[in-house]
Amino acid sequence: MTQTLHALLKAVGLPVPAGVANATVTALTCDSRCVGQGSLFIGLPGERVDGGSFWPAALASGAAAVLIGEQAAAAHPPAPGDSVLVVPDPVAFWAGELASAFWQRPSMRMELIGVTGTNGKTTTTHLIEHLSQACGRPAALFGTLVNRWPGHSLTATHTTAAADRLQAQLAEALEGGTQVAAMEVSSHALDQQRVAGCRFSGAVFTNLTQDHLDYHPSMEAYFEAKALLFASPYLVGEGPRAVVNVDDPWGRQLADRLGERAWRCSLAHEADLTMADLRMTSNGVDGALRTPLGEGRFHSPLVGRFNLMNVLQAVGALLQQGLPLPLLLNALPSFRGVPGRMERIVLTGSAAEDHPAVLVDYAHTPDGLRNALEACRPFVRGQLICVFGCGGDRDRGKRPQMAAIAAALADQVVVTSDNPRTEDPGQILDDVVAGLPADAERQVEVDRAKAIALAIAQARCGDLVLIAGKGHEDYQILGTEKVHFDDREQAEQALRHWR
């Protein structure tokens, strides 16, 4: 892929300096280490250093031109004659728009559905991918666990990738035959303009509960970051293009703002998308799904009321893209779930009833933990045991809240470490335990492996152990180091030693 710098700048409405107008751009990157001959380097501000300060190194590495923001230019002024373009901040916006233009606007040549919210993004995007594929529409998935499209799969490092990589991946997905793409869109990505250059033909709001208040100054700011996805320039197209959970108070506020642009979905009230005649068992749920385009019977193997909302929103989003309801409902039974989301741990060669039930889930917020525990309760014949912790260097306010929820909904609580990061693990546990009632059945074990083993060792047949917080993650962050750690492996090992 090559383009002239003149064409790229003109495509996004930036002025074209005479000195570099005829330069040919062969690659676009925001990483100075990846600059080669003919690259356009865009210097982005970072947490510790401003990437714009690396413009001399980028030019020395052969960059055709460099683009930096006004703040970086003030700190590291380029000399007259340098191939450095200074643009208004935030430079991240221009990075996304230029990357999109360089790759020929890939998001506008597919049906890109963005999913945002505190909980439910991963399951909803996986559902959209699965249902699209089952309906004969090749699909891509961009999210917390994986970025994949036909013929390609790559473990994700962030919920939403940086703009230069994201646009390149969208272009590659398009080349691979993708027609529908489901993307998890985090509040950080929206606030930091990582999805600049994307045009979404559909958007889903799952819910908003306390999380990331170490980053956002308030819940209102957190909401407004999420709401950016549903406004120009991101959400495009005529007619209803959004699916919003109005059982959530923030969702009701968003739906009121969007008006006829949104389909409202609810499990509690009349809405555009609803369910009725529900029958829940350990094998999933059966019921009727009602939409503005008709209704039908469905079966889903997913357990838990919160998963019903994920199903409702995935079906609604794809209906808005023109997929037929009968095909979508027929495809639901074959969706088996997402790794680390209410994942059952069963020993090979052993019947499930021969040992305590063990589930691993990613629940790491107050609402997520409540949903997971409530989903478990109908299937517990004995005691419900909850193992959980809270991440370090993150929102401290949710720690006592999660403890109170665990104590209220579980019979026994084992408090342990999650990802302590650079915070004192003992202090994190103290913050959590402060939320436990004095009479709560609790044990505290800072070593997560020992805590999992302890919970499973004391469980009996008929009990259920929920290990919450890390889900699919196969690492633990201790200090600044990532070490291998997988709740599923630890649970399986503990089950092998269970009496």
From Swiss-Prot:
Q: Where in the cell is it found?
A: Cytoplasm
Looking up Gene3D superfamilies in the UniProt record yields: Mur ligase, C-terminal domain (3.90.190.20), Mur-like, catalytic domain (3.40.1190.10), MurE/MurF, N-terminal domain (3.40.1390.10)
Q: Which residues are the signal sequence here?
A: none
Report one GO cellular component.
Answer: cytoplasm
Name of the top EC class for this enzyme: ligase
Q: Does the keyword Cell cycle apply?
A: yes
Pathway recorded for this protein:
Cell wall biogenesis; peptidoglycan biosynthesis
Q: Which InterPro entries match?
A: Mur-like_cat_sf (IPR036565), Mur_ligase_C (IPR004101), Mur_ligase_C_dom_sf (IPR036615), Mur_ligase_cen (IPR013221), Mur_ligase_N (IPR000713), MurE/MurF_N (IPR035911), UDP-N-AcMur-Glu-dNH2Pim_ligase (IPR005761)
Reactions catalysed, semicolon-separated, are: UDP-N-acetyl-alpha-D-muramoyl-L-alanyl-D-glutamate + meso-2,6-diaminopimelate + ATP = UDP-N-acetyl-alpha-D-muramoyl-L-alanyl-gamma-D-glutamyl-meso-2,6-diaminopimelate + ADP + phosphate + H(+)
Its annotated function is as follows: Catalyzes the addition of meso-diaminopimelic acid to the nucleotide precursor UDP-N-acetylmuramoyl-L-alanyl-D-glutamate (UMAG) in the biosynthesis of bacterial cell-wall peptidoglycan.
Name of protein = UDP-N-acetylmuramoyl-L-alanyl-D-glutamate--2,6-diaminopimelate ligase
Species per Swiss-Prot/TrEMBL record:
Synechococcus sp. (strain WH7803)
Encoding gene, per UniProt annotation: murE
